[in-house]
Amino acid sequence: PISPRGHELFSWVFMLIFTLMKQKKQIIIFTDLDGSLLDKDTFEFNEIEDYFRELISKGIKIIPNSSKTEAELLDFNEQNNLDLSFIAENGSSIHGLNKIHQNLPDKIIISRTKDEIQNIYESNISLDFKNKITHILELEREKQQKILGLPLDKIKLAIKRDHSLPIKFNGTEIEKNEFRKILKNSGLTIQTGGRIMN
């Protein structure tokens, strides 16, 4: 859920990045994580790790762009001895841009806060639709684990959201599309992943 001001910032940041990279002739690769860089079942990147590290050693910048939280992406960096810039929560925040160029900030927020999103949701979504929605953050850890497919020790990182509310929609496709329209008219967007919506 990026605000209009967020869209302007997002465009400005990427225009600046590409201008700077063009001047320095650097290569940047933007990649998703789950199901792309990471195995969709094990969340490991063993199969591509050697090639991945070879690219980094050649000075190629790799920027994960993920629905994952800042906490999850920091953990990914730490667990794999990496220091990557990254885009968290479906473009809601950009981290470590100063690693790409010293004139860029460390962190840019281009979305509403979780509380702002919750307030818009409460004010604009009917009870009928609310009854079709499971809020992942409100579930017990075991149920969160079943839905997200993550080990228990990773759940606490996955639910540490700053700019999105993970949900599971329990209605028909027609109802889901209507729900999307209501959110859009309320100034919010929703992303559908392999397991949940944000």
Predicted regions and their residues:
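Active-site phosphate-binding/coordination module
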Residues: 44-137
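Asp-based phosphoryl-transfer active-site loop
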Residues: 25-41
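Short, small/polar residue-rich loop motifs at catalytic or cofactor-binding pockets
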Residues: 23-26, 49
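Conserved acidic, metal-coordinating active-site core of Asp-based
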Residues: 128-198
